[in-house]
Amino acid sequence: MFDADKGWSDQLDGKKLSIGIVQARFNEGITNALAEACLRELAALGVDAKNITHLKVPGALEVPCALQALAESENFDALIALGCIIRGETYHFELVANESGSAVTRLALDYQLPIANAILTVENLAQAQARQEEKGRDAARVAVEMANLLYTLA
């Protein structure tokens, strides 16, 4: 997803798309900034606010469960995962990062549904703050582009 705004794509028209967003509340200052940037970019790409479902869950490990519920509804063209995992002093960082990332990827493949993964995994708060705006925008662009790409392949 890095630098999704680089280059050009003709797949960034979001006018007819329905998007689901699942945001972790843990590290809420960062995840709120991710969500705000993501929602602004979705609007800029033409996604109607009434076609966006935005859910909040406790943390990154809960994101996949909510994504699965949205995927099972078959009401969405793409989904977006938002969260922030900051390394601490224990192995918990690796566990949460690996398990949440793996589950998001597995859901995308199992449901053949694009899921833009913007669950940040960073060493410290400064790294998260440096990425919150860009990665929120990137997630919106990835979701719209991949939804449109899969429609062209159907």
Curated annotation (Swiss-Prot):
Keywords from the named record: Riboflavin biosynthesis, Transferase
One BP term from GO: riboflavin biosynthetic process
Entry EC no(s): 2.5.1.78
Annotated organism of origin: Polaromonas naphthalenivorans (strain CJ2)
Record protein name field: 6,7-dimethyl-8-ribityllumazine synthase
Reactions it catalyzes: (2S)-2-hydroxy-3-oxobutyl phosphate + 5-amino-6-(D-ribitylamino)uracil = 6,7-dimethyl-8-(1-D-ribityl)lumazine + phosphate + 2 H2O + H(+)
Job description of the protein: Catalyzes the formation of 6,7-dimethyl-8-ribityllumazine by condensation of 5-amino-6-(D-ribitylamino)uracil with 3,4-dihydroxy-2-butanone 4-phosphate. This is the penultimate step in the biosynthesis of riboflavin.
Residues that, per the record, bind 5-amino-6-(D-ribitylamino)uracil: F26, A60, L61, E62, C84, I85, I86, N117
InterPro entries membership: LS, LS/RS, LS/RS_sf
Gene3D superfamilies xrefs: Lumazine/riboflavin synthase
Gene Ontology molecular function, alphabetical: 6,7-dimethyl-8-ribityllumazine synthase activity
One cellular component term from this protein's GO annotations in UniProt: cytosol
Family as reported in the entry's similarity comment: Belongs to the DMRL synthase family.
Active site: H92
Enzyme class: transferase
Keyword Transferase: yes
The protein's annotated pathway: Cofactor biosynthesis; riboflavin biosynthesis; riboflavin from 2-hydroxy-3-oxobutyl phosphate and 5-amino-6-(D-ribitylamino)uracil: step 1/2
Cross-referenced HAMAP family: Lumazine_synth
Keyword hit for Transferase: yes
Annotated positions binding (2S)-2-hydroxy-3-oxobutyl phosphate: E89, T90, R131
